[in-house]
């Protein structure tokens, strides 16, 4: 479409207006933008995208950094210069000190125009060594100035061996996939939490968010150095999944575009259409030109489905949750399948800017099966591109020129209070670039008396300028605004070892009303190895121990004082049972990993002492067992915990006797329906550290379909921990397997395939037909047929080949040439679809819901579609297996498992009717080994009719 036609095809949420501010030929293949202090826009143009199919560098680097300007102030850019050319795949740009940083792997470049002609005459490699061994869309990107004056970048799911040409004396930083940051003034480079793909943003309070293709919003909660203080802490997570992800991350496109997954035969039962498959450019809007109340909204671009989603961000403990602002309809969507939003930004005018790469296809050819590549033109649109501006409708756009280049220090400091986030960030950047230490007095006044924005920016600017004083931080930690206290604690962390004043001011904040403040107090205490920390950390743990982030922060800061922490934790006011159990489990893991055998035996004896009611004890022992496992003391016949208590000493004998008694009680707790779920789960985990002879019967009972799925899955994992062969065999016993729901089956397969000693048990079950070969799915068969153990590999190959040459496969292979020889007619194919398929399957919005929606398979090769018609059991979509449930009133219900809850399951029968069944009413539940789709449908149709049906299913394809 022309730029005007493309603009007309956009549908934006009511209350907003959208304007086209730049289009080809002014911009081409834009993927990122940045505004400098004069309001000029730098555009990273990735014209050479995608890289060659065979990998390696592009034949001729085509990337450009364009400098575009609005010369007449009408809000539309009208002049361009090629600021820098000959770049491979530039994918990020950020203004700094009169020039720009550009991410163009393997290098981070600095480009600057020193003579004012609009062309960079200075080009310097700041950092180098970022990997280029993966496709162009999986490389480091998004240079973004953080509140601390460092520039943050996403990993692009990639790594490198990064060095600084200006500082050859510095050691290389090697990593496989981690986000990073560098100091633009010193060139220091270090890794940070998160593994973002193509998207990085900060909120007004300085918190960092990233994204990946199937993960629209992640919040970076912790940083790796904060977790390294305690080497025995088994916690490595740094990000919280804020939004729904994967198949749950819904989008509502108005176009009919394709996703790469639609072309992969092994994914035909799990199409990505209707879910985020290319989330990028995650952006928290901090401008003032959107409708009132929209500050802090999260925007995510979805280029594969031609839309931008707006989500609402809500606090969730120390982190956040988000949800689509409108269910069923997007913030911005286009009917034009070439609309490819990839990057979002705050503008100088407070508006939201959207970068549209505008391509026919946006993907890498290596991700598309070879037979389907001919349907794509990966370079079509490389000379096009559009940039849009969105603001509140009915509000006059800001037209005042922006030029902070000559602004005085006084003006810049005053700007730190403005509601426009871009202006605040730019003012802070300029103060840092100028090393404006003379502004310390003004900044100090602002940090004490400004609004929230001003206080936060002033604090971090003083820190970057090295003029921040301890009393500034103390004042911030006592501020009435929670976010100011939070940032005050963050600033205090690295100063604590040298500042008793800060330490004393920090202690009362252990009882702060804000969870994020308490989180950072716990983290800050880890910066100083002081025994006084322990009581404070115990206070936080008793209040917040159920939160995994706060628990990890506390235990990281405990360092090597686990015994002292245990004493302080149990000596204080009683914590809630759930809190006590969670803390004691992780604390037990620390003891098991680090303490001597004698100390661990003493803990087993103490915890296993007789009590009236079990609550936290199983959790603590399960944690201890997990810690012991890391020491490699388990034998082929015994778990690490049982090995510990089997020593030939009086201490071990006492511990063993007490543990045996507690194990019996743990089994009773696990079976008790009304007991708290977390206590039952801990008890089940502990049973998995015992012996099959003592725990097996209880764990098998927990696999019954009457039990909640979460209980069944916990039992599966526990059985997988037991060392005896009969334990694993119990998981794949045919009658039991048939009763499992898909969720439980998946857990069984995951557990059995996780240990080499258990794989043979699974292969035995497949060989005896107790488990259908198709139940494993293609990906698991690929793992087995590539197994490192030759015996397993050869046996798996034999079983898989037997399945591939069975009767149904022979029928398929016989029919395939004849069907493909016909030219199918989509119009004629509607009749067999209506006759045989529509009752169970939806296609293009019409049909039943018993089977999978077929709308997403229209791009599959004809041979793959024929395979599923002739051989419906070849691959059964998880969730569409047939189940037979006998219930207490004598009825038998057959259908697919539509959903399951802790206390019930719902089946949808062949007529489309749903049946909700309380688990306690289930007498038996059995899964069929075959698909709900009847075999032999191909026998009712001629080869020509099959070709017509396939053509109909593919009728919406390009």
Model-based region annotation:
Residues 154, 192, 203, 211, ...:
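Generic beta-strand/beta-sheet core signal
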Residues 119, 159-164, 186-188, 317-318, ...:
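Inter-heme linker and motif-flanking segments adjacent to c-type heme-binding CXXCH motifs
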Residues 377-383, 390-832, 850, 857, ...:
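Long, ordered, helix-rich scaffold segments
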Residues 1-411, 422, 430-433, 502-503, ...:
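Beta-propeller domains with acidic blade repeats across secreted/periplasmic ectodomains
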Residues 21, 41, 98-100, 105-106, ...:
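C-terminal capping alpha-helices of c-type cytochrome domains
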Residues 130, 286, 312, 391, ...:
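Sec/Tat-exported extracytoplasmic proteins
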Residues 747-749, 753, 767-794, 848-855, ...:
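Axial heme c-ligation environment in periplasmic c-type cytochrome domains
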Residues 280-281, 351, 385-386, 461, ...:
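C-type cytochrome heme c attachment motif
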